[in-house]
A protein has these predicted regions:
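Feature of secretome-associated and extracellular-like proteins
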Residues: 2-83, 88, 99, 123-250
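Charged, amphipathic alpha-helical segments
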Residues: 55, 64-66, 114-123, 289-300
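Hydrophobic alpha-helical segments, especially N-terminal targeting/anchoring helices
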Residues: 66, 72-77, 93, 109, ...
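Structural signal for hydrophobic/aromatic residues that build the beta-strand cores
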Residues: 70, 90-92, 113-117, 134, ...
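Short, acidic Ser/Thr/Gly-rich low-complexity loop/linker segments typical of extracellular
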Residues: 98-118
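Long, compositionally biased charged/polar stretches
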Residues: 191-687
Length: 687
């Protein structure tokens, strides 16, 4: 009697006449085994390992009388028709109601997605004709401590065949599988998730607990503030700030008033804070190695007219090892102006302007905060890495490249799916709290994604001795190079043997990336010119991309099914780039949120037009965020900085090669001296 029937009978208060013991379910056995201590697990393993790991008895497929055929393709067609789902594991089963299903055979799809599984109908059981079902599986892996790979298979779908099939031939035909599909409605390379649907992956269990632990202390605070607002009793910004844990800048101001608003601190955070970005030389001071420029062109995008977001042009200078702002030029629209390219009035501020200089610095700081959230954080890390994650999941199965990349690509599509409505979109936090409209945000992200390419990327060199971010980035980049070189030395032969998967991976990347974007200013100043002020190492090759019609932003690794000269090195560079942004770069932008965006009056995503304009003091609350936006900002900054799960050195899922862990541990003291606790760097983007 089946377990199901025995339990139904028991639930009705009846007793089974059968004396046989209740059948243990696999999950029951797994829970029991997980509860044993190490000594007990070793004892059980000694007794069962030979049977658990024993391969199924193999039979010569040619001797099996029946065959099931078919072809697996992606749900969505490509330009030339159906796209093959290559190298997926497929299993053929006999469905049985109330008793365990019977395994009939297995195989793999070929390069065209076709499969043929030979089987014996008698394996369905005596007197039973098989009820055919096809099941598909994707590969998973873990690493043992010695670097050996352990492969497992995760079921991703199934296709029902006929009941009581008595023939010796069955063709499942072309089976369309909705697997890691691109969203045809998005100009970016984004994963398609239907309304009320879920992505084809899941968070590791520990991540949910870490999220709850981080957010629980502040969730009630935010909800209380929001309820007070709905009741018409919104708390003051000072009360909102005081209700949250003390932020870094608030503590510094308490201990040393004015310290975080100083020119020196402004420059230091541009070098080493979450605002850290590429520092170009000042093009108006050719040959001056001490002069720098940061330019943020916001007038190119649609704005809501309620917030003030001018073009920001900051000129900086190294003075005795410190980067100091010396001039800020703001291209101010008129209040209420919304159209891209609206007329602007340019105003210049210097330290001699007193309160106006402080207001200009605040505007520049807010602008840099929005830029890092849309650029360094959401664009260059989250959405940029997502396009590599989709292409990798669609194409890498037999190639060992999967073992190198997948640990750093897992979960990014999940957190990005949450961002679709939480941060961006018509009701997203960035849309509500900044000057950019939904269209403005989308266009900015499209332009940003059009400027990202793996080819030729290397972290920029430090501009001064105190440029800790750049030094840490270069050290991390070097260690990734050592890790990847060793991986290719170990697996290079098989990697090249499965190069056709690399070609398909590369094809998907290029096909679905946005067109390269080069703004009018750079198009006029850089391509074909020396332009020594322009930092090229972290930018795409403008000479190659500033042509008409514009090529795709992401460069191809290969165009053939076997590697050509230089292409293996190109693939190494791509891997290094992806892992760098999924780990170090994201950690730096994300983990410093509470440090640099934990005080509403210090920095936020948008200042409003007030009665006296937008360039006023912090005491003028007309320009500051509204209470509901303020509490949400602090909640988000805390959540991003304090959700701790998925660190490289913890390696909870054991999917990162132990070599990378060893390299980072060996250089932990060097990172610490640069202000980075390497234990806080995640292996992937999951927050």
């Amino acid at each position: 009697m089946s377990t199901v029937w025995r339990r139904i009978i028991a639930s009705l208060g009846l007793k089974s006449r059968s004396p046989e013991a209740d059948l243990l379910e696999p999950d029951e056995l797994a829970r029991w085994y997980a509860g044993l201590d190490l000594k007990q697990r070793l004892a059980v393993s000694r007794n069962l390992a030979s049977r658990v790991r024993a391969p199924r008895a193999t039979r010569d497929p040619a001797t099996l009388p029946a065959v099931a055929r078919g072809r697996l393709v992606f749900e969505q067609d490509g330009p030339r028709g159906p796209i093959a789902l290559h190298h997926l594991k497929v299993e053929l089963w006999d469905r049985d109601f109330g008793t365990p299903d019977d395994f009939l055979g297995e195989g793999f799809t070929d390069a065209d997605g076709a499969f043929a599984i030979r089987y014996d109908p008698a394996d369905a059981g005596e007197g039973d004709l098989p009820d055919l079902e096809l099941r598909f599986f994707e590969p998973q892996h873990t690493f043992r401590k010695d670097g050996r790979v352990v492969e497992t298979w995760r079921r991703i779908g199934s296709e029902r065949g006929p009941d009581d099939h008595g023939g010796l031939q069955y063709d499942f035909g072309t089976v369309r599988v909705p697997y890691w599909e691109y969203d045809p409605a998005s100009p970016l390379a984004r994963l398609l998730v239907v309304e009320e649907g879920t992505p084809p992956t899941a968070y590791a269990p520990g991540r949910s607990l870490a999220m709850l632990k981080a957010v629980a202390p502040i969730e009630l605070i935010k909800r209380q503030h929001q309820l007070q607002g709905r009741l018409g009793q919104a708390p003051s910004l000072a009360k909102i700030q005081a209700d949250y844990p003390e932020s870094t800048t608030a503590r510094m101001e308490r201990e040393s008033p004015g310290s975080t608003r100083s020119d020196a601190y402004f420059g230091e955070r541009l070098l080493n804070g979450m605002f850290s970005s590429v520092m170009d030389r000042d093009p108006e001071a050719p040959g001056d190695a001490q002069a720098f420029r940061l330019y943020l062109p916001w007038n190119a995008y649609e704005q809501d007219g309620r917030h003030c977001l001018p073009d920001v042009d900051v000129r900086l200078r190294l003075v005795e090892g410190r980067l100091l702002p010396v001039r800020i030029i703001l291209g101010m629209r008129e209040p209420g102006a919304t159209a891209p390219g609206s007329p602007v009035t340019r105003r210049t501020f210097t330290p001699a302007d007193g309160a106006d200089w402080e207001a200009a610095k605040r505007m520049a700081r807010v602008s840099a905060t929005l830029d890092v959230e849309l650029g360094n954080h959401l664009g260059q890390c989250h959405f940029n890495v997502e396009q590599y994650a989709i292409a990798a999941h669609r194409n890498l199965r037999r190639n060992p490249l999967r073992w190198l990349l997948m640990p750093h690509l897992r979960e990014v599509v999940l957190i990005n799916h949450s961002a679709n409505g939480f941060l961006v979109g018509s009701t997203g936090y960035i849309t509500r709290s900044s000057a950019l409209t939904e269209r403005g945000i989308n266009k900015r992200l499209e332009h940003l994604m059009g400027s990202y390419d793996w080819k030729g990327f290397a972290p920029a060199t430090p501009v001064c001795e105190g440029h800790r971010y750049a030094k840490a980035g270069q050290l991390f980049w070097r260690l990734l190079g050592e890790h990847i070189d060793a991986f290719f030395a170990e697996h290079g032969t098989e990697l090249e043997a499965q190069w056709h998967e690399v070609r398909r991976f590369s094809d998907d990347l290029v096909t679905h990336s946005v067109p390269a974007f080069v703004c009018r200013y750079l198009r006029a100043k850089v391509p074909g010119k020396e332009a020594p002020w322009f930092v090229r190492s972290e930018r795409m090759d403008l000479d190659a991309k500033a042509v008409e019609p514009p090529p795709k932003a992401v460069s191809a690794v290969t165009h053939t099914d076997s590697p050509q000269p230089g292409e293996v090195e190109a693939l190494k560079n791509l891997c290094r780039y992806v892992i760098f942004f999924a780990t170090f770069r994201h950690a730096w932008a994300n983990n410093l949120q509470w440090e640099d965006a934990g005080e509403v009056l210090y920095s936020c995503l948008g200042l409003r037009w007030g009665k006296g304009g937008a360039l006023s003091t912090e005491e003028d609350l007309d320009v500051a965020p509204e209470p509901d936006e303020a509490t949400e900002m602090l909640w988000i900054s805390w959540m991003l900085s304090k959700t701790n799960y998925g660190f490289i050195l913890s390696n909870e899922e054991e999917d990162v090669h132990p070599r990378l862990l060893e390299l980072l541990r060996a250089h932990a003291a060097e990172f610490a001296a640069l202000g980075l606790d390497v234990r806080t760097v995640s292996s992937r983007i999951n927050i």
